[in-house]
Amino acid sequence: MSLDGWEPFWLGPASHRLYAALHAASGAPETGVVLVPPLLHEMPRSRRFVTEVASELASLGLPALRFDFHGTGDSAGSGEGLDLASMHRDLDLATAALREKTRIRRLVLIAWRGGALAVRGWLERGGCADLILLWEPIVDGGAWVRELVEGDARERALRPPPRAGVARATDPSDGQLMGFPAPSRLRADLEKTRLDDGMHRHAVPVWAIVRDDLAALSMNIARRLPLPANAPSFSIGAAMDATFFLTPPVRELVGKLGQAVREEAWA
């Protein structure tokens, strides 16, 4: 079944089912892209945006596969089981599925925000790609968790009582951050993960799509693509129900990105 040029499907064993969708490209492309989603509350907000980016890349001749991590989105499983090790298995499944379905020779990963932290560990444990693109990546997992905890406390304080005489749900012991399950194992994984030059031990070129006001990444970036100032923001101060769209300036950026990926020469 195809929906507007892309095909949804399940991947992985019955015990670890992942929702995925392939945005196919015409011809016999040699390069394909796996889109690694952001984490927690940033994933549903950017779902339409990531879908539009995948379609745009496919129209440029780059087949793109997007997926939901196990325990998130439309994938099976509970968010209580979410940690970086599970995400690494999911990346194995997603990259293998794209290779199998398209017979590409070169693999590119585009990782949004916290998804970049998962990609770092995936490379450490033997994940193989030809190019990594980090889209507004979270550089310091520990600092991000602290930011989320503070933002979560503010959000809880603003919640109205569910009904008269019932207190607000402000107790963080429910294990959630920004309304999504964030088990202790996931928090511990994120807190000890940073993007640094260790990624380059794997001889994979790394590009970054960042805003001008983003602090310099503590790693060598082979190529930097500036994100338009008016691009949708992942800032924790943004409205929780805000949905991202592929605005004309960002669409132009994705076009330049796709062209650059197609022109990139791999040894």
Tell what function each PLM region has:
Residues 40, 69-74, 139:
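Alpha/beta-hydrolase active-site loop signature
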Residues 121, 125:
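Active-site signature of alpha/beta-hydrolase-fold catalytic machinery across serine-
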Residues 72-106:
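Catalytic nucleophile-loop/oxyanion-hole region of alpha/beta-hydrolase
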Residues 108-120, 136:
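Gly/Ala-rich beta-loop-alpha elbow adjacent to hydrolase catalytic centers
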Residues 49-50, 78-83, 239-243:
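Short glycine-enriched, charge-decorated loop/helix-capping segments at active-site entrances
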Residues 15, 24-68:
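Short, surface-exposed "cap/lid" segments of acyl-processing enzymes
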Residues 126-267:
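The alpha/beta-hydrolase serine catalytic core
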Residues 1-31:
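N-terminal cap/lid segment of alpha/beta-hydrolase-fold proteins
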